[in-house]
Structure formats: structure tokens, C-alpha cells
Amino acid sequence: MKQRTLANPIKAKGVGLHTGHKSIMTLRPAPVNTGIVFRRIDQTPIVEFPVSPELVKETMLCTTIVQEQDNQKIKIATIEHLMSALAGVGIDNLYIDITADEVPIMDGSASHFIFLLQSAGIQLQEASKKFIRIKKQVKVQNEKGGVAEFSPYEGFRLNFSIEFDHPAFDQTAEKMTLSFSSTAYFKEVSRARTFGFMKDMEKLRAQNLGLGAGLHNAIGLDENGVVNQEGLRDKDEFVRHKILDAVGDLYMAGHPIIGEFTAHKSGHALNNQLLRALVADPEAYEVVTYDDEEPPIQYGSSKILV
């Protein structure tokens, strides 16, 4: 299987969920073995962020990558939904030029990003696609009962369970398993929106968070249930969105993962902690390619320009 980039550049603009800052984002094709590289083009000189687990420095309600320049922290927040879409489509190499400190939230899911990527077209490249294959179990947990682990599996399977004491959540909608392929990702999780509790908004805004949030780009929950007039896109949209987030957070590894991911009450911090634990143990994984055989993960073939 070959590496993939975009066939053409494409632009999007929007508002950041937490900062409320407007930004223009340009996705541009990149050469083989470049990886995914975010670029703050509003900075002089331009600040580059080649994705890796170590670049994630803040995980309060979103995944934020940070570089230092002239003793100043330069950030890009809320990258997880775009990273999730890139993983879903199977993009290996891409420059992401952005004019502010947060990726636009769009509708709160990954569906707008997938539309952008498919509109630009997918270009196959003359190099083998690399995968990270899990060889042994790696597990992390936190003091709040959150657990995340990798284990060997021929494919990419995600098991996620959440636990919220709230009327909008019920037991039948708090667990989900996704056997990853592009088709399954598009159909099962790409449209699931981020969510938040109305009671927390005042506190968040005091911390300069949630400044761009609204019912047009998130699911709002009050003490009785969902506030959005249109309701949920799926009964279990909450756990579907958690899987969407996890797919994006785990793609910070730099390559698709072949293995099983199991999580309970995990979030951006624990997802990143798991990736760091994985790369810290060279015996836990290997980088593999599939030149003469089909990989255990299937990517859609639509919009591919050879």
C-alpha cells in the first residue's frame, strides 16, 4: 500500500471552539515521508509542528500542540477532529497552514474536514505506507478511574466506554466498538459532534475556554437533557464522538496503528499518555509496510488520483 497526500490544495475558514479566534486553514500536498505538519503562517518566522506525541503539551478539553520560539509558547489548539479525519481518509503527508492558534471547529464533528479532503482528491505516492503494529499490551490509567490500553490485533479496533451521571446518557448508549476502515469511520463516527454541559460554560469562559462554542457547533446539555432543537444525530452520539477524538489523538503517533485500543473514561490526556508509554517501549511496537499484501486496515478508494 502506498502513502497518500492530497491531489490539490484546499482552504477552509472558521472559528475556534475555545479561543473564538477566526482562522484560515490551507491543506497542501506534501512529499513522501513528510508526515503531517501544522504550520503557524501568521508567525515570523513560520513555526512548524511535525506531529508527534511529544508535541502535545495541553489537554484541557482539547488536544493542543505547542512549540517554543524566542521564549514564547506558540500553540495550535483543537487539532483532534482534523487529525481524526486525516486518519479516516488515510492521509500520510500534509502541510496544514493556519493563520491563528486554533483549528476551526466547523460543525463540531469531522464531517466537514472529510468533505474538504475528498473535494481536494487523494494522490497516491511512490513510497510504502508505514503502520505502527502493536506487539504487546501497553496500559495507562489515571486517578479518576480512566483506563486506556493497546493490545496486539490484526486490524485497528477501538472499544470505548463512557460514564456520565446525566439523564441524556443511558447504559445502552455508553459503549461502542469500531472495527476501523474508512467506510466504517465515515458511517459510524465522522458525524458525531463534540458536547458540553451548559452549567460549565460560565466557569469555562472565565478560563478563556468555550468562547466560540454554540449549538451550531456542539451538543449542549442542561440538567434535563439535550438542548439542541434537532436532537442527537445518533442515540449514542456521545460515545461515537469519544471514538472520533481517540482516532485523532492516536494519529499523533505519525502512522496508522495496527492493534486494539480499549478505553474507559479516557480523554485527550490519557490518550496522549498511552501514546507516550508506547513509544517509550521499543519492544511494544514495530513499524511495518505492506508492499506485497493487503494491510489489515482498508481505506476507501473514492477520489483517488493516481
UniProtKB/Swiss-Prot annotation:
Record key words, sorted: Hydrolase, Lipid A biosynthesis, Lipid biosynthesis, Lipid metabolism, Metal-binding, Zinc
Its EC number is: 3.5.1.108
Q: Which InterPro entries match?
A: Ribosomal_Su5_D2-typ_SF (IPR020568), UDP-acyl_GlcNac_deAcase (IPR004463), UDP-acyl_GlcNac_deAcase_C (IPR011334), UDP-acyl_N-AcGlcN_deAcase_N (IPR015870)
Picking any one GO biological process from the record gives: lipid A biosynthetic process
The organism's superkingdom is given as Bacteria
Please provide, in alphabetical order, the Gene Ontology terms of the cellular component aspect for this entry: membrane
Q: Which residues are responsible for catalysis?
A: H268 (proton donor)
Q: Which cofactor does it need?
A: Zn(2+)
Molecular function (GO) terms for this protein are: metal ion binding; UDP-3-O-acyl-N-acetylglucosamine deacetylase activity
- Top EC class of this enzyme: hydrolase
Q: What is this protein called?
A: UDP-3-O-acyl-N-acetylglucosamine deacetylase
**Originating species:** Hydrogenovibrio crunogenus (strain DSM 25203 / XCL-2) (Thiomicrospira crunogena)
Q: Which gene encodes it?
A: lpxC
